Amino acid sequence: MVYLDTDLMRFLDAQNKLYLTAFSEIKKGKKQTHWMWFIFPQIKGLGTSSVANYYAIHDLKEASDFLQHPVLAKCLIEISKLLLTFKRKSIESILGDLDARKLRSSMTLFAQVENADPVFREVLNTFFAGEEDMQTLSLLNSSSVKLAVA
């Protein structure tokens, strides 16, 4: 499946409005508003809300396309690096429990992309003792099987 820039527009549109808010909140060390879905997207199949489904990454190909997009990749890498400035804080104290789990899923997803920036692994190592999200890996594995069969 080939993804076009138009497929990623949902992220660009949302980030256009709220990326600076998300960045500012992380810089202050405390997430306060709702933006996780499109700043740190997860693989399709994890979220149950309509918003989570809308911003879900469909498979590893779309994750790769996301990281090849000049704006989306820059923003994801930049805000992920910003998180690392809080190495002495728990990620739950910054994002809350649920959003910390979403971050782990997102970092697991993007760490699987070939030649991905090492920041995704570094976030996993720093805040999650290097442990990837098993549900994300399972969903990626099942989506790659579907792609191979198609």
Task: Enumerate the predicted regions with their spans.
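Extreme N-terminal tail/first-helix region
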Residues: 1-20, 141, 145-147
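Short amphipathic alpha-helical segments and their helix-coil junctions
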Residues: 12-25, 83-91
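Amphipathic alpha-helical segments within well-ordered protein domains
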Residues: 23, 64, 107-108, 125
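Hydrophobic/aromatic-rich, well-ordered segments within soluble, folded domains that form packed cores
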Residues: 25-60
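Residue-level detector of well-ordered alpha-helical segments, enriched
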Residues: 31-38, 75, 99-106, 119, ...
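Short helix-capping/linker segments at secondary-structure and domain boundaries
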Residues: 45-51, 111-121
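Mid-chain, well-packed structural core segment of small domains
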Residues: 65-114
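Charged phosphate-binding loop/patch that engages nucleotide di/tri-phosphates or the phosphate backbone
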Residues: 115-150
